[in-house]
Amino acid sequence: MDRMCEERAAEDGSDEEDPDATEAPARIRDTPEDIVLEAPASGLAFHPARDLLAAGDVDGDVFVFSYSCQEGETKELWSSGHHLKSCRAVVFSEDGQKLVTVSKDKAIHFLDVELGRLERRISKAHGAPINSLLLVDENVLATGDDTGGIRLWDQRKEGPLMDMRQHEEYIADMALDPDKKLLLTASGDGCLGVFNIKRRRFELLSEPQSGDLTSVTLMKYGRKVACGSSEGTIYLFNWDGFGATSDRFALRAESIDCMVPVTESLLCAGSTDGVIRAVNILPNRVVGSVGQHAEEPVENLALSHCGCFLASSGHDQRLKFWDMAQLRALVVDDYRRRKKKGGPLRALSSKAWSTDDFFAGLREEGEDAKTLEEEESEDDSD
């Protein structure tokens, strides 16, 4: 059993306390404690097998923490200050032995996870600041920069395997199909890009949307592609129809800055208003709030290897953990029957609305109740 799961199960254990014990038992929390940084985090990633969380901040520092539900046991293991400018993305290798980081300083770094030692540096990996990073397999990774450039790298070789520039603006996010053949890119030019990394060729760009595309993820077992945008709208594409959107729906948020899939139908979206919304795809609706960074934009989201926790980072310089149990157990149809028009967002974790009266008046998502109902009735089928 995973250590984190063991700790959570211990809350319900029946072991009797030792009457002679002098020390109070350690408190077991629902989630690990918040981690406070000295600067906002701009990159966030969980280890694929261990209870470790990596973060890169706007000062260029990289941190690795061990996390635990046992109070006082979430600790910094090491930090690295090798980047000269903001560290914008971090990712663990498939075996968890390396941490890859990219930066505004145009460099890619490979760090040893156990020791925090810099093992390799590609100093001028791009001609422009690097903004996004995606692991393809144990040897290959993809990077995207501020001018729309995409590069594919094999860690066993010196130069890039592929170098393309089809977008006119920054690469905000990237995703990969299950066969690891097609690379999908979300760009500031409002287009979804499709690149065949097996044949190392460009496939197509979608029609531009009215705002920047800020995030991209596959849903519905790869049949749908969801893109978040700077205008607070989620755009949906059919897998075989990347040229134009198949559907869209707006959240009451100025911008969707990051998204992470939780199940094949549910994703979490972080927004500039500080709220982390749980969103169901087909039928399309916001089902509640997982958590929040009080009035501070949510920059990054990551899901733990066991699926129990969502981690988030915001401008408040905190890394927060959210319990996913209630969201995973949610039945969307039941939620529809209980939903009250104009009511507040449903809390999907014990901490969802824990800190600020600002959120008490946050209303149900959508342009208005009538429009939301019309969208739901249209979107209930694939």
Curated annotation (Swiss-Prot):
UniProt keyword Phosphoprotein, yes or no: yes
The places in or outside the cell where this protein is found are: Nucleus, Nucleolus; Cytoplasm
Is the keyword Nucleus in the record?
yes
**InterPro entries annotated for this entry?**
WD40/YVTN_repeat-like_dom_sf (IPR015943), WD40_repeat_CS (IPR019775), WD40_repeat_dom_sf (IPR036322), WD40_rpt (IPR001680), WDR55 (IPR017422), WDR55_POC1 (IPR050505)
Region called Disordered, residue ranges: 1-31
| Residues that span the membrane, as ranges | none
Q: Which UniProt keyword terms apply here?
A: Cytoplasm, Nucleus, Phosphoprotein, Repeat, rRNA processing, WD repeat
Q: Name one GO cellular component term.
A: nucleoplasm
What protein family does this chain belong to? Belongs to the WD repeat WDR55 family.
The identity of this protein, by name, is WD repeat-containing protein 55
